[in-house]
Every structure is written in structure tokens, then in C-alpha cells.
């Protein structure tokens, strides 16, 4: 499903139309079957589905004096001496999930199963036993999570509709891990290992969002998720993503947001990545016609950039539901591809047209994606802002990029870009010397500065830094047919040794230089500015 050169898949995230998150407690098999039939008829191929944690593992903690723990129970009933009971899992819910799998198989739908669904749409959902507990770091909670995951995977692994196991929905929202730098790794390792013990045949999907390129910037990071799972995921909503909620939803920056973020995750992680959740977040953010425009842009861009697949959030509107989070969160009520009256929205029609166009044109196989340059994300910068801007600027200049970080072995390329360097670390010495060695062997390197320190610098670039200072105004960049003004973090006074001066400020100080295959610009005018 996720293999290189495979079939680009389309679909959505699914909660039943009649009950949303309460679908397992308010089970209606006929409605679920009708939902899946409607989605299949509109070219939906893949559903991401969620066994809600407290419904599937409804355990309560029973204690004696001084709150000393005695046992877990189903309410007042002891846990049965069965595999399900020992895992704290309700077998009725497992059978309901099995029915969902059967309907999916009937309508040729593939399922991605989010196993630990403890966070959903702005609300926590945990068993009564773990109310008020940090379920990412508490060892007892983790023990029961592992037991549930192993039981569900063991019971459901023979269901042919299941294509992949997902750790859960945005599990990095389920609790803080800042007190222990390895807690995120430990939780991910425990759940992914539990899956693989019971089923090594299917890929393990991260299900996380908002990962960072470096661990120093966030304990949930691309590298460690890629180490422990097979497939990374993006949830690229402009409203919740820095630098993205600036333009109308259907314009260039938002049209490429999902693609840029997914390529960054996949490139830096060096594993497959796909668009697992996306959408406009409803009529408070965008009208139906522009939602359809965004759908088309994400689908065609995702296809062209080898993003493997795209799932919309979500299948059905939930505007008739009274439970939280729908009672709390206005923005969660009208996110579906289908209205409450079962009328398909323009976004679903756009998805259907895209899918049928691929089939009609025999384009289902994901084409190779050529990259012309490597963008190197460095320490002490806003990696997402710099990477996103670099991706867009490259598009405007007519070429495509792949991403790497300054602490990785770099892929071979004829063109490297080290954008918006800032801070005192930037790139470790051994990595910097290896990059300069690539330049000596014929590669081109473009460095843009946001006040960052590189060493050695003067000799390779053929310049001297005379002094630095705090800026008092934007820097002028004046060259052949060009004059623009750029805000900068630090003002650098340069003098050219043997570098060619491509642009200067109003005082004649070089601000853009070239020496052999090295290009340097002191004010990084556009590659971190998204406002």
C-alpha cells in the first residue's frame, strides 16, 4: 500500500454518520454498512478507523484502604479469565469491529486501524482506570495499553480489509513528556513492538502530527518516529500549522502545504509518508467550492510528489450530535465529505473525479519524483518555516527539492541549499567539512544567512567578515535588475577577497557573493519569511 511506485490511494477518516465517536456504544450495523456503501460508490478506497479506547478497554481501578490497588474490573464485574478478559478488552466491541471489517471487505475498502484512540477532536478518551493519569508515561497505563493492542491485533490480524496498524490518533496529544527526554521514544517503542509481536506482516503507521526535525526542538520528532514505525503521517491543517493560515485556503501556499510537509517528513525520516488527515476545517474557514479546490490541489500535488495517498477529515458531518467534543467544538461539526442528509459535498465529488481520472488515464502508479536540489535544515532555526519557504521558492524558480537535516549523511546532489542559518551551532564541524568536500568535487552550495555562524567560512567563500552589529533598518539588496529591502537578524559587514559580488547594499557592502561553486547571501530575504 505504501511501497515506492505503488498505487496512489484516496479516502477519508471514518466515524459512523449516526453517532460519530459514540458509534461503538450506539452500534447500528445497518447504518455503518450504508455509510461504507455510499463512500465506496464515490471512489473512496481507504478508511482510517478508530477503536475508541474506553469502549474497547472499559476497565476500572478498584482499591482498598489508602487507595491501595487491588484489581481491575469491568465496572463491578471481575475481568473474565479469557484472553479478552486478561487484556481488559470487551469482546462485544471486538465483534462489532469485526463486522466493520466485513463490510469494508464487501465494498473493497482498505482499513488503517488507529489502535490507541485516547485523543479525538479536542477531547481525551481514556478508561475510567486512567482518568487523570498521564497515559504516555504511567507504567500501569502503558501495561494495559500494550495488552489491549496485542489482543486487538491478535484477534483482527486475519481480517483481509485491514491494510495497516496505526499507533493511534495524534497520541502525542495524550499527555506531556517534557520531564523525560526519552519518554516519547519509550511509548512509541512499546506500542509498535506490541503490534509487531502479533502481526509482522503489516506496516506500522505513526499517526502523529506536528513532529520536529531535531529532537532539540521537540521530543516527538521525525527521526525517532521513523526509527520505530514504517510510515510517517502528516495532518496538515493550515489553521493549526505555523506559517500556513495566512492566505485563502485555495491559493498557492495552502495548495502546497500538505505536499511540502509530507515530503519533509518522508525525506528527513527516510521512510514512507502520506497525508493522513487533511481538510479545510469546515464552513467557518472555507466555502464548499474552495474546499473542492483544495481537495483537487492536495490530490494532484500529493500524487505528483510521491506522497503515497491522502485521507480527508472526515467522512460525515457531525452537526446533529450532542456529545462532547461536538458540543464544545464548533469547528468539529461540519468537516465531512457527506452532509447529515447524506448528500455528497463538492469535495467528495472532486475526490471521485480525481480517482476516476487516474483510472481513465492509466495513471494509478505513482510516478518517480525528480529532485534537483537538497535543502539542508540546520540547528537553532525554525525548521518548518525555513523548509516550507524553501520548497515554495524552489517551485517558483522552477525546480524541486528534497530535505535533509544538518546531522544526517547528505544524499548525493549537484546542488545543496543551506538556508537561513542562525545561531552558534548551525551544523557540526564534520558535517560542514563533508559538505565543503562535495563542493570541491563539483557540487554547488547556496548559503543564506540569518545571522548564523559557520566555520571555516571566510576562506571557502572568498570574503571577510569585517564586523557584525544589530540592524537598525532593513538591508538593501541591489544588483543587476534587482533592488529589494530585507529585514535581518544581524547586520554583517563583508569585504570580498576573491569572491564575485552579485549584490551590495546602499553603501557598497557585499550582501550576495559567488566563489567557484559557493553562493552566499547575508540577508536571507525570503527563505524564512512567510508573512
Tell me what each language-model feature is:
Residues 172-177, 243-245, 261-294:
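Active-site clefts of carbohydrate-active enzymes
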Residues 191, 370-397:
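Short, charged N-terminal beta->alpha structural module
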Residues 423-531:
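A conserved amphipathic helix/loop scaffold
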Residues 394-410:
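A short, well-structured beta->alpha microelement
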Residues 2-229, 292:
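Active-site mouth of glycoside hydrolases
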Residues 208, 219-252:
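Aromatic- and acid-rich polysaccharide-binding/catalytic face
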Residues 293-325:
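Substrate-binding cleft of secreted/luminal carbohydrate-active enzymes
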Residues 331, 343-358, 516-518, 522-531:
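Extracellular ligand-binding/catalytic regions of CAZymes and related secreted enzymes
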Amino acid at each position: 500500500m505504501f511501497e515506492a511506485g505503488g498505487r496512489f490511494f484516496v479516502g477519508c477518516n471514518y466515524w459512523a454518520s449516526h453517532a460519530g465517536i459514540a458509534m461503538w456504544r450506539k452500534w447500528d450495523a445497518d447504518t455503518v454498512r450504508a455509510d461504507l456503501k455510499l463512500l465506496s460508490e464515490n471512489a473512496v478506497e481507504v478508511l482510517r478507523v478508530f477503536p475508541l479506547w474506553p469502549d474497547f478497554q472499559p476497565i476500572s481501578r478498584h482499591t482498598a484502604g489508602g487507595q491501595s490497588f487491588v484489581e481491575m474490573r469491568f465496572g463491578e464485574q471481575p475481568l473474565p479469565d479469557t484472553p479478552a478478559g486478561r487484556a481488559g478488552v470487551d469482546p462485544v466491541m471486538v465483534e462489532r469491529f469485526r463486522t466493520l471489517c466485513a463490510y469494508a471487505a464487501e465494498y473493497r475498502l482498505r482499513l488503517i486501524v488507529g489502535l490507541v484512540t485516547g485523543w479525538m477532536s479536542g477531547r481525551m478518551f481514556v478508561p475510567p482506570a486512567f482518568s487523570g493519569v498521564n497515559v504516555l508515561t504511567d507504567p500501569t497505563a502503558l501495561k494495559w495499553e500494550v495488552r489491549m493492542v496485542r489482543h486487538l491485533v491478535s484477534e483482527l490480524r486475519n481480517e483481509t480489509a485491514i491494510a495497516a496498524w496505526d499507533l493511534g490518533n495524534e497520541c502525542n496529544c495524550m499527555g506531556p513528556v517534557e520531564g523525560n527526554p526519552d519518554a516519547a521514544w519509550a511509548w512509541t517503542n512499546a506500542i509498535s513492538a506490541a503490534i509487531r509481536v502479533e502481526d509482522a506482516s503489516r506496516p506500522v503507521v505513526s499517526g502523529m502530527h506536528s513532529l520536529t526535525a531535531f529532537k532539540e526542538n521537540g521530543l516527538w520528532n521525525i527521526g525517532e518516529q521513523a526509527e520505530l514505525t514504517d510510515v510517517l503521517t502528516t495532518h496538515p491543517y493550515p489553521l493549526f500549522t505555523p506559517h500556513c493560515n495566512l492566505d485563502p485556503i485555495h491559493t498557492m501556499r495552502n495548495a502546497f502545504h500538505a505536499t511540502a510537509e509530507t515530503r519533509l517528513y518522508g525525506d528527513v525520516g527516510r521512510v514512507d509518508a502520506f497525508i493522513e488527515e487533511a481538510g479545510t476545517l469546515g464552513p467557518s474557514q472555507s466555502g464548499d467550492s474552495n474546499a473542492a479546490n483544495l481537495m483537487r490541489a492536495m490530490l494532484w500535488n500529493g500524487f505528483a510528489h510521491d506522497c503515497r495517498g491522502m485521507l480527508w477529515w472526515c467522512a460525515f458531518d457531525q452537526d446533529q450530535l450532542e456529545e462532547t467534543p461536538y458540543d464544545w467544538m464548533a469547528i468539529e461539526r461540519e468537516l465531512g465529505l457527506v452532509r447529515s442528509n447524506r448528500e455528497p459535498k463538492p469535495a467528495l465529488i472532486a475526490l471521485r473525479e480525481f480517482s476516476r481520472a487516474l483510472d481513465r488515464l492509466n495513471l494509478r502508479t505513482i510516478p518517480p519524483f525528480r529532485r534537483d536540489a537538497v535543502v539542508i535544515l540546520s540547528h537553532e532555526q525554525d525548521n518548518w518555516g525555513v523548509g516550507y519557504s524553501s520548497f515554495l521558492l524552489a517551485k517558483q524558480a522552477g525546480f524541486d527539492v528534497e530535505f535533509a537535516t544538518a546531522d544526517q549523511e547528505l544524499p548525493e546532489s549537484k546542488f545543496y541549499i543551506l538556508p537561513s542559518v542562525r545561531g552558534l551551532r548551525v551544523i557540526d564541524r564534520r558535517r560542514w567539512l563533508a559538505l565543503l568536500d562535495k563542493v570541491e568535487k563539483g557540487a554547488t552550495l547556496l548559503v543564506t544567512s540569518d545571522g548564523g555562524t559557520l566555520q571555516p567560512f571566510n576562506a571557502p567563500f572568498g570574503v571577510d567578515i569585517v564586523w557584525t552589529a544589530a540592524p537598525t533598518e532593513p538591508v538593501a539588496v541591489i544588483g543587476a535588475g534587482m533592488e529589494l529591502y530585507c529585514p535581518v537578524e544581524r547586520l554583517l559587514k563583508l569585504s570580498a577577497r576573491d569572491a564575485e559580488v552579485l549584490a551590495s547594499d546602499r553603501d557598497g557592502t557585499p550582501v550576495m557573493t559567488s566563489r567557484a561553486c559557493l553562493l552566499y547571501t547575508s540577508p536571507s530575504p525570503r527563505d524564512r519569511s512567510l508573512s
